[in-house]
Swiss-Prot record:
GO biological process, alphabetically ordered: ATP synthesis coupled electron transport
Gene name of the record: MT-ND4L
Protein name: NADH-ubiquinone oxidoreductase chain 4L
Organism in which the protein naturally occurs: Canis lupus familiaris
Subunit structure of this chain's protein: Core subunit of respiratory chain NADH dehydrogenase (Complex I) which is composed of 45 different subunits.
Swiss-Prot/TrEMBL keywords: Electron transport, Membrane, Mitochondrion, Mitochondrion inner membrane, NAD, Respiratory chain, Translocase, Transmembrane, Transmembrane helix, Transport, Ubiquinone
Length: 98
């Protein structure tokens, strides 16, 4: 395993750990999720370029489209929650509260 793959995997693990540690704020969770998507995009692109897979060359673009949709939905949810409750705590997203 080359150092490039190890560094990308380490970036993914650090983003995942950040997602687990800073899960109380929605903005921190969204940033960690974007870090995970970015590391997956880079890993997929490097793997496709190294293996000369021409049929799978559209997969990183599809991943970027899903990441952009996820970011747009996450930011709209962040704006809605911050306008409604005044904070970005994830506990405010529980719909079962009275």
């Amino acid at each position: 395993m080359s150092m490039v793959y190890i560094n990308i995997f380490l970036a993914f693990i650090l983003s995942l750990m950040g997602m687990l540690v800073y899960r109380s704020h929605l903005m921190s969770s969204l940033l960690c999720l974007e870090g995970m998507m970015l590391s997956l995009f880079v890993m997929m692109s490097v793997t496709i370029l190294n293996n000369h897979l021409t049929l799978a060359s559209m997969m990183p673009i599809v991943l970027l489209v899903f990441a952009a949709c996820e970011a747009a939905l996450g930011l709209s949810l962040l704006v809605m929650v911050s306008n409604t409750y005044g904070t970005d705590y994830v506990q405010n997203l529980n719909l079962l509260q009275c």
